[in-house]
Amino acid sequence: GKMGKKALEMVSNKRHDKEFDYLLKNNINDKYDSNILTSRNISFRTPKFEYSGACAGCGETPYLTNLTRVFNDNLVIANATGCSSIYGGSTPSFPYSIPWASSLFEDNAEYGYGILNGINMKRDKIKKYMKEYPRNKVFKKWLNNMNNYDICKEVYKEIDYKKHPYLNDMKDYIVPKSMWIVGGDGFAYDIGYDGIDHVLSKNDNINIMVLDTEVYSNTGGQASKSSNYGATASFASSGKNNYKKDLARIAMCYPHVYVASCNIGYNNEQYLKALKEASSYDGPSIIICYSPCIEHGIKSGMEHSQSNAYLATECGYFITFRYNPS
């Protein structure tokens, strides 16, 4: 640069580091917390997904942030290949502080289903062990409420692990887990759809979240089965010549599947309700989440991605609903 000075000069940031650490360690937000799920209350909870490397204004990350705020430590995520696996697991940074693992496009649904079966096997072993002690009040409390998060959390603290070393190795499974299969529309509508269909056909309590950008985002912008009629993208400039696959309607062909279509930019409370309903529903569930993307070419810029998402539902382009078979 001019005068021999560098255009970018690195300086010490120790003073700000101390201030930042103070804010993290002296977090008093929890006292404002409430079991009532609203946008305000949920914002006071410390998320288990922070500082990702996603694009500025990414429409996917708010869904994941709120997912971790709702389910906290009992959340387990199986993530498909795509944008969410890149900003979710790029070395050396890792934005999650809950169990998270990534698999391929074509087998992530089966991968997540396998994790759920592994968790259930561990919990069945705990159940079998506790049944051998019918007079133990703590064990009886767990056996009668083994799917109740709050009560199981109490039991977790009350168990004498010195007397029962067998449970010490499996204590992480005493509290029930909320299992989520997460991926984009490339995974859910296209490459991994066969796995999605297989999981939805079962009766297990498993949840699927589709981060629907309506385009192959991570690979630079190609049309997917989620792209709408006439939609253009960087590598599909001629426009799509057929219609968007109606994944929600297909899922509802199974009468036992919980289905929701959400747009956090339009109504965050509706999304939060869908999360709780899906997790508490005793069966498979799928939530399709409209996610504005840098590949959409929003003229006002990605800082307006959420207001753009609001308009998508306001004009009827993306419909939101919750369908609960129960």
Task: Describe the predicted segments one by one.
Residues N41-T46, E50-A54, A109-K137, Y173-V175, ...:
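Conserved thiamine diphosphate
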Residues Y22-S34, P95-L104, A223-K245, E303-T320:
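Acidic, Ser/Thr-rich peripheral helices and adjacent loops at domain boundaries
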Residues G1-H16, L23, P62, D194:
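Iron-sulfur cluster-binding cysteine motifs and their immediate structural context
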Residues D190, H198-I206, V210-S226, A231-L247, ...:
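Residues forming the flavin
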Residues G1-K6, V11-N13, A78-A80, V182-G183, ...:
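Generic beta-strand/beta-sheet core signal
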Residues P92-P99, L272-S326:
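Glycine/aspartate-rich loop-and-adjacent alpha/beta segment that forms the canonical ThDP
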Residues E60-N66, V70-V76, I86-P95, K157-Q222, ...:
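Thiamine diphosphate
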Residues T61-V155:
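Catalytic alpha/large subunits of respiratory electron-transfer oxidoreductases
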